[in-house]
């Protein structure tokens, strides 16, 4: 792997089934003109893209290959300037760029940019477009100065019609030595969830919520169709100043729903006695024809809360993505982190926003969790079949040799 001033790669140890599901991890190093490392990154990455073909939109998932290299366009920044960058190239004209910035106490990946070459017919067969397309997004990757950003859990960065998933990541910029710091700043996904002291009569966790079919209609017909079970996971401070985490199922039998529609915005609103408002806001990106959940708003009455209620809002999500006209489906439980104190747990999701034909769902786009759950048994089955074949061949060869040893006299 080439890098300014040189770069190194660590030996790779691939496990049989892990190698079948996820790509290999690699160490990427950027050095300054004196040969001193200023950026080090060690992670594996998966890219999930949607591109247009003559027969319609097509999803493509691929890994960052072991042969990926650090580009000479990577930079440590000029003198003590805060901006520096790691540019990774792979395949036929694909690049992943991490742009860093810092202040006196912390540094972060301010921007992640992915440029992919639609002329690469091996990666994007039957693409109706050619040339390089570039997407970018801010990230939550940040750490204290002189500490390594560490995240064993998956970290997803959504960029228009591309989702980049990093795994087992160790990243450090503005290095004080040529190695990762032993001190780490862990990502929020790796931190233990808040726990509460044992209570005399703890509230049991609720069972999976009931699945219900919701719909929202406007002047042009149905704009949102959803079948799902919803569960609220909230962390709050009680009147006794103890912090607790509780889960609440949304009971369809005690909930009313409504919403509104526009050309590029569809909102589902749920109300009940304690659930003053749960709003899910879906948007359509007209340039990419991608539909996704962008906003979640919660207003919940909690009698034992110190504030008497709980509120949370996030209007910058990019979840539950699908192509306009298609439906999104996920049988696996999904935990959507809305804020640090609120997660929306979703069960057996099947939904479609925009271009809904009456009360029927369009062509299905499966979620990544469902696709991964199918890959593992296929990989295990293939390995077992290969093992059985080897044993059978060994048996037949041994039997043939034993017969050859008994010749008629």
Curated annotation (Swiss-Prot):
Membrane topology, record value: Single-pass type I membrane protein
PANTHER family: LYSOSOME-ASSOCIATED MEMBRANE GLYCOPROTEIN, LYSOSOME-ASSOCIATED MEMBRANE GLYCOPROTEIN 5
GO CC terms, sorted: caveola; cytolytic granule membrane; endosome membrane; late endosome membrane; lysosomal membrane; membrane raft; plasma membrane
Sequence segments annotated as region (Hinge): 188-219
Name of the protein in question: Lysosome-associated membrane glycoprotein 1
Function as written in the Swiss-Prot or TrEMBL entry: Lysosomal membrane glycoprotein which plays an important role in lysosome biogenesis, lysosomal pH regulation, autophagy and cholesterol homeostasis. Acts as an important regulator of lysosomal lumen pH regulation by acting as a direct inhibitor of the proton channel TMEM175, facilitating lysosomal acidification for optimal hydrolase activity. Also plays an important role in NK-cells cytotoxicity. Mechanistically, participates in cytotoxic granule movement to the cell surface and perforin trafficking to the lytic granule.
Species: Bos taurus
Subunit structure, as described in the record: Interacts with ABCB9; this interaction strongly stabilizes ABCB9 and protects ABCB9 against lysosomal degradation. Interacts with FURIN. Interacts with TMEM175; inhibiting the proton channel activity of TMEM175.
């Amino acid at each position: 792997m080439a890098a300014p001033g040189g770069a190194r790669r660590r030996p790779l140890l691939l496990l049989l089934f892990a190698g079948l599901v996820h790509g290999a991890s690699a160490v990427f190093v950027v050095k300054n003109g004196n040969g001193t490392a200023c950026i080090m990154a060690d992670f594996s990455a998966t890219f999930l893209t949607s591109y247009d073909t003559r027969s319609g939109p097509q999803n493509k998932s691929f890994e960052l290959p072991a042969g990926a290299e650090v580009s000479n366009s990577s930079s440590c920044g000029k003198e003590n300037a805060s901006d520096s960058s790691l540019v990774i190239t792979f395949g036929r004209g694909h690049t992943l760029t991490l742009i860093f910035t810092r202040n006196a106490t912390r540094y972060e990946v301010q921007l992640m940019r992915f440029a992919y070459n639609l002329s690469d017919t091996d990666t994007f067969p039957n693409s109706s477009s050619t040339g390089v397309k570039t997407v970018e997004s801010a990230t939550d990757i940040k750490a204290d100065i002189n500490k390594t950003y560490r995240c064993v859990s998956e970290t997803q960065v959504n960029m228009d019609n591309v989702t980049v998933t990093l795994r087992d990541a160790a990243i450090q910029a503005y290095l004080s030595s040529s190695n990762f710091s032993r001190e780490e700043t862990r990502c929020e996904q790796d931190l233990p969830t808040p726990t509460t002291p044992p209570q005399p009569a703890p509230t049991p966790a609720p069972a999976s919520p009931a699945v219900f079919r919701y719909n929202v209609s406007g002047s042009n017909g149905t704009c949102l169709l959803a079948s799902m079970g919803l569960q609220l996971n909230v962390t709050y401070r009680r009147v006794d100043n103890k912090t607790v985490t509780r889960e609440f199922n949304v009971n369809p039998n005690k909930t009313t729903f409504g919403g509104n529609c526009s050309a590029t915005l569809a909102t589902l609103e749920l109300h009940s006695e304690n659930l003053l408002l749960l709003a899910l806001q879906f948007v359509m990106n007209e340039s990419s024809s991608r539909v996704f959940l962008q906003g979640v708003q919660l207003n919940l009455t909690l009698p034992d809360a110190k504030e008497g209620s709980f509120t949370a809002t996030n209007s910058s999500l990019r979840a539950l993505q699908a192509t306009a006209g298609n439906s999104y489906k996920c049988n696996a439980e999904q935990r959507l982190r809305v804020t640090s104190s609120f997660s929306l747990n979703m069960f057996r999701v099947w939904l479609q926003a925009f271009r809904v034909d009456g009360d029927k769902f369009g062509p299905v786009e499966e979620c990544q969790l469902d696709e991964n759950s199918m890959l593992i048994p296929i990989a295990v089955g293939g390995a077992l079949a290969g093992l059985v074949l080897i044993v059978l061949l060994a048996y037949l060869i041994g039997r043939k040799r034993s017969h050859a040893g008994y010749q008629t006299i």
